Amino acid sequence: MKVSFDFDSTLSEEKNQKLAKKFIDAGHEVWITTSRLSTEHGRSKGWSWIITQNEYLFEIAEKVGIPKDKIKFTEGEDKWKSLYNFDIHFDDDDIEIELIQENLPNCCGVLMYEK
């Protein structure tokens, strides 16, 4: 299975990191798909805060076992446009989940949030 996790308020949470590790341990391909701007984009604009912010994302990705080439920065675009050929995507944003359900019939969008 090809599985994707949003980062902020999703894979940044310890319990979801454990879930991602379980998918990896079971042999599934796990990605991070985030609306964040890429480090390269931040560097080109001179926005050092993006570089610092993404260091935390890379740290968590390494901890979980997700290589850098399996991290997709959508640069603010709707995530569904980056999730063709994915089976499941976990996100805390209900609008992103709705867009996945509307546009990607073969991808299951799962809403993850704390009440």
What feature does the model see in each segment?
Residues D93-K115:
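Asp-based, Mg2+/Mn2+-dependent phosphohydrolase catalytic module
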Residues M1-T74:
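Alpha-helical substrate-recognition element adjacent to the catalytic core
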Residues H28, D69, D87, N106-C108:
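A structural micro-motif
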Residues K15-F23, S82, E96-N103:
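A short acidic, amphipathic alpha-helical/loop segment
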Residues I71-I95, I100:
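Conserved Lys-Pro-Asp/Glu-containing loop-to-beta segment of HAD-superfamily phosphomonoesterases
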Residues S44-W47, E77-Y84, V110-K115:
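Noncatalytic linker/hinge segments flanking ATPase motor cores
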Residues K21, I66-P67, W80, N106-G109:
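Generic alpha-helical hydrophobic packing signal
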